[in-house]
Amino acid sequence: MKKIFLIVLLIFSLQPIPATAAVMKSTKSIIELPYLKADEISDISLTPVSIVLTGTTESASSTWISGSLGGLSDGFIASYSSLGAPLWNLRLGSTANEIATSTAIDIDGSIWVAGAGTAIITPTPATTQGKALNPDNVVLDPALPSNTPLNRIKLWQVSSTGNILNTFEFVSENIIHPKKILISGANLIIVGDSYEKSAVTGFYIIATKTGVFSPIIKYGVKSTQINSAISNSDGSIVAVGSSGDLLLNVKPLSKVDAVTFKISSTGVLQQVARATLKSTTRTWSAIDSGLLQGGKVSYSNKTEAAITKFSALNKPVWNVRYLSKSTTLVASGKNSWATFISSGVIKGIPAWKPKVATPVLLELGKKGEVLTSYTLAAPAVAIGANNEIGTAVITDSGASFGLVLIN
């Protein structure tokens, strides 16, 4: 019996010990930015020395955005040092309603901001023939100005010190939601979603840096969305999103597939790669350099965060999925980074068995393995990475935004 026990003990001693297993660490925001209404941070851009945030505020005033609310919503942009010190901020608003959704930093250091806006409609006073009868001297309420739908693509150029350099506008026939702005040589590319009644289509539009817009190009007919994109050196882009439409004569494989688009420099749809699983709804929410993509898979009874690294369209290098309560945001730095709300075990983190869904941040290696892992105090709404600053994450607690830095 003793001999058998020693043999069993020897066998267990020879089992590989996960010496490199990741341990979940906690994080703390270096700054907190409070808000009162339904404010949003939509994008983050990093320079070697600063962190640029952009989004939309509905709060009447703010402790970290100068000025007061113009319409029902204003876009904004704010810059912080790598230590979280405020550098400058700018309200991108007027008496109309605006949103700001994406930023891109130009070679001269200026920042291009994409968003959308309304226009104010001033009613024309009714004309009357002669003197109207009004025996009771009733005071008539004047007709009030109203807003058009959110059908204007807004484009702002902001200096590296926070001054407005240019403002341009394109009027769309439909409600518009720009999701991503890219710089391609002398041009700007904006992609996102266009809404008409119950239908949503992806859109692509080019603008020169002097504000000349090309005709808008749309993809899909009823249920196609573009959520993000990256640019290629030849002027083409790779965009990601979802679609339940026929695209390039390829039918959807499920109700809604996650799709990756290759779009030429003139907006021609060249290639579509679909990701699908039977009886699911899928979407890609994010893409970063090196074809790192993040999204989610929705089943009838669960949701998974999906993270895939591709070598080319439809050619995955590695793929991981984790039980989740959200989609996945990704960023490419020295390694791959992903953030989502974890609701189950994560391979490579043996001790991670969350009792409640918890926002996490993962650093992934060349084969998709977990290198380091962190919990976040609130869900992430934006993530970015570069070699100088590291990885920056914006969290949203519902009452304030937090800035988390991993160096």
Predicted regions and their residues:
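Positively charged n-region of N-terminal signal peptides that target proteins for export
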Residues: 1-4
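Bacterial N-terminal signal peptides
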Residues: 7-15
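A sequence-level/structural motif corresponding to short, flexible coil/turn segments enriched
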Residues: 20-407
